[in-house]
Amino acid sequence: MNWLRPSTLIDAFAPSEGPPPDSLYAFFLWSLRGAFPVMWVAGLLSALVGTLEVISAFVLGRIIDTALASGPEAFFSEHLGLIVFAGLFFVLIRPLTFGLSAAANGVAVQPNVNPLVLSRLHRWTMGQAVTFFDNDFAGRIAQKQMQTSRAVTDVVSEIINVVFFALASLIGAAIMLTAIDARIAAALTLWLFIYLALIRFFMPRIRVMSKARASARAMVTGQVVDTITNIKTVKLFAHHEHEDRAALKAMGTFRERAVDFGVMAATFRVALMTVAGALPVVLIGGTLLLWGEGIASAGDIAAAGAISIRIAQMTGWVSFTLMQIYANVGEVEDGMRTLSPPHTLRDDPEAGTLPAGSGHVAFDDVTFSYGRGAGGIANVSLTLEPGEKVALIGASGAGKSTLVSLLLRLYDTEGGAIRVGGHDVRDITQESLRRQIGMVTQETAMFNRSARENILYGRPGASEAAMIAAAEKAEAHSFILGLKDFMGREAYDAHLGERGVRLSGGQRQRIALARAILKDAPILVLDEATSALDSEVEAQIQLALERVMEGKTVLAIAHRLSTIAHMDRIVVLDGGRIVEEGNHRKLLAQGGLYARYWSKQSGGFIGLNDAAE
C-alpha cells in the first residue's frame, strides 16, 4: 500500500553497493540506485502533462472549427458532447494529471533523493582514512557533500519536470502540425535543429564554468569555517585582518568565477530568446499561408498559434533548466573529485572480528614514516602482556603518538606488524579492533551534543545509572549538574558547544575519561589524559584511573613523569626508536635519558626540545 503514501516509495537511506565510480554516468547510477522505478513513474506523468498541453491546443482548434461551421444555435444543440468533453478535460482531467505529476516529483522523488545521495556520500566519506581529512578543510568536505547531493537532486527533478515534459510536448506538437500540413511540421523540425545547435554550443561551456564556480565556492566555505572553528586563536593573536584578507581573497576568486558564469549565461539567454521569438512567426505565418490556399482552417491557425506560443515560452524555461542541469552536472563533477577517491585504508574482504577481551598487544619490528621515507618510527618491537601498564615517554616527535595511531590502525605500517590478541590488525576489521580500545587524549573531542550523548558515545546502549556512575568515577558528575546551555537545557541535557567550547580543558578531559570508563574496553590508551587538570583534580583523577586500569592493558603517553612513575614498565623513545626500557627505579639507576628527564623536572614535564645527546 506504499502507493497511498508516496513519500515512502523510495528508501531514503538505503546503502549503495561498492565505492562511488569516477565516471559521471556511473556516479549517477550509484547515487540513485533503488530510486529509478519511482523516478520513471514521475517522468512518465510529466510526459503525460506535456502531451495534455498539445491536446489542449487540439481541443481548442476543434471547438473553433466546429463553432464556425455550425453557427451559435446549432453548436450548442448539436455538439453538446464536445462541449462536455472540453469542460471535463480542462476542469478535471488536466488539473488532476498536473497534481499527480507534482506529487510524484515533489513528494515521492525530491524529498527522498537528496538524503539518499547525501547518506551514501556521508557513509563513504566516513570510511576514509584520517589522512583524507588531514589534507583538506573540514568545511570544504562538508560543503562538497551538501553541494553534490543537492546538485544530483536538482538534475533529477529538472529532468522529470522539464525534459520529459518538453520532449512529450514537442513530439505531440510535431504530430499535430503534421496533421495540418507536413511543411509546418518540417518548419518546426528545422527550428528544433537550430535550437539544439545553440544548446550544444553553450552547454559544455556553462558546465565547465559551473565546475570552476563550485570549486571556488567550496574554498570560501572551507576558509570561513576554518576561521570560525579557530576563532579563539584568531582573537588571541589579533589576526582579524589576516583572516579577513584570506577570506576576501577566496571570495574574490569566487566572485570572478561567478561573473564568468553569469556572462556566459546572459549571452546564452539572449541568443535563446532570439531563436525562440522566430518560432511563432514561422508557424503562425506558415499556417496563415496554408489557410489562404484553403488547406488549413481557422481552428488550425488557432491550434498552431497556441502551440507555437507555448513552445516559444517553454523554450526559455527549458533552456534555463538545461543551463541549470549542466551547471549542476558541473557541481557534481567537482564534488566527485573530492569525495570519490577510493579508501586507502580498507578492511580485507576476509577480515575477521577481534574477540572480546583481547588484551595482548605486540609491535613486531614496526616501521612507519608517513610515506616520507624518514622520521616516524623505525624497527620498534614492543610487547604488552594482558593487564600490563606500560608508559611511553620521549621528546615531541619521538614517535609516541605514531605508535598509538598504528595500534588503532589509523594508518597501516610500512614495515613489520602489530598484533592484538595474537591477530594481525590488518586481518581484523577496523571497527572490531577499535571497540576493544578505550582512549583519552590530550585534545579531547567533544560533539556539540548533550553531556549525556557525549558520555554515552563510549557505550550507546548503557543505562542512565551506568552513565552517571562513569561520570562520578571521572569526577565529572558534580560540574555536569551545574551546566546550562543557551537553550535552557540543564545538567546532562545541556549541550557542550562545538568541540566542547563551553567547557574548560579540565572539564572536557573529565567527560572524555567518563566516556572511556563507560566503554570498559580491555585495552586503554591514555595520551596526556590528565594534562589539562589542576593538581587537586589530577590527584582525584589519578585515583579514578588506577581503579579503571585494574585488569586492563594500558599504554600511556606522558610528558609529566610523575603521572607514570608507578607504571609496570616505562619505554623511552628517541628519534623513532626504543632507547631505554624498564621500571622507574631501574631507569633512574641506569642514569640514561629517562634519568636526565627526571632530573630536569620538578613535578615533571618533558620539554619540546629534550632529546638524547
Regions found by a protein language model. Name each.
Residues 121, 125, 234, 335, ...:
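Helix-loop junctions and hydrophobic alpha-helical segments within the transmembrane domains
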Residues 35, 101-102, 106, 110, ...:
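Juxtamembrane loop-to-helix connectors within ABC transporter transmembrane domains
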